[in-house]
């Protein structure tokens, strides 16, 4: 990107909440540097990204689109900033899942849209990941129904329905939604969309499960991965049922926290049926 230069400490780190810079922060820093130092931004980006002036002109003032183009061209596979990972680049799946569980969280598998070669063997992949500690599956439904091309939409909707059915078969609750990692993403998914009708119940059940686990872990340390949960629910399916029930009972916000904390501190020895009964009594 010569002659544009950025300084990591000066230009990138101030964009982060806690010094945890990602490639997106670097893209924003470069875009800002170009605005400060280049008189013809369109010409600059057209040359560096190997695009036409018209294409750059059409997105230059659209933050998410120009950011995504810069990131995809320079930082993804084939780009000058891409480094091919090796087996030593990242910790193992088992190590990551152990850390996640130790934090009281839920190790999740991820699913894109069902069209890649790997996701065509999704059952085999999920069974492998379950063996490594995964207990839930993350889905971004917008990718599979909010699509302009009718044929692509039809194909991806079928893949969505298939993965939800497979998750049910494998006792994997769903963590559904769009991560807030880029401007323009949905804040809340439209579960009322007709296309999501066949999977809405599974999504809502899973939302109750995620909330039930989160609330009980935060207030009592009795989340899905706790020793208490494993002692009382030897199977993932039984744990799923309990935390889904709890999630439907516990009110949101401070009221839910207060109701949970009213349960005896000795609740590590409490029968789950007693926990649910006490939660219901507090309604």
What would you call each of these model-derived segments?
Residues 42-46, 51-57, 70, 81-87:
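Short catalytic-site patches enriched in acidic/histidine residues
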Residues 61-73, 79-283:
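Charged catalytic cores and adjacent phosphate/nucleic-acid-binding surfaces used
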């Amino acid at each position: 990107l010569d002659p544009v230069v950025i300084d990591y400490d000066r230009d990138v780190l101030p964009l982060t909440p806690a010094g945890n810079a990602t490639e997106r922060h670097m893209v924003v820093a470069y875009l800002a540097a170009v605005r400060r130092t280049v008189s013809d931004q369109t010409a600059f980006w057209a040359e560096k990204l190997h695009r036409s002036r018209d294409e750059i002109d059409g997105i230059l003032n659209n933050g998410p689109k120009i950011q995504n183009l810069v990131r995809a061209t320079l930082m993804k596979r084939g780009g000058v900033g891409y480094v091919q990972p090796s087996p030593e680049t990242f910790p193992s799946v088992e190590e990551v899942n152990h850390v996640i569980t130790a934090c009281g969280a839920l190790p999740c598998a991820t699913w894109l849209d069902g069209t890649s070669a790997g996701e065509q063997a999704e059952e085999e992949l999920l069974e492998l990941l379950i063996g490594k500690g995964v207990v839930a599956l993350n889905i971004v439904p917008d990718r599979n129904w909010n699509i302009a091309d009718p044929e692509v939409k039809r194909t991806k909707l079928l893949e969505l329905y298939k993965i939800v059915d497979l998750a049910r078969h494998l006792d994997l609750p769903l963590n559904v939604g769009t991560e807030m990692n880029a401007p323009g993403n949905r804040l809340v998914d439209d579960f009322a969309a007709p296309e999501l009708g066949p999977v809405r119940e599974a999504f809502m059940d899973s939302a109750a499960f995620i909330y039930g686990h989160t609330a009980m872990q935060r207030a009592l340390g009795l989340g899905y991965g706790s020793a208490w949960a494993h002692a009382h629910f030897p199977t993932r399916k039984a744990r799923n049922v309990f935390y889904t029930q709890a999630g439907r009972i516990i009110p949101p916000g401070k009221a839910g926290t207060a109701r949970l904390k009213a349960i005896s501190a000795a609740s590590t020895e409490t029968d789950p049926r007693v926990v649910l009964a006490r939660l219901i009594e507090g309604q």
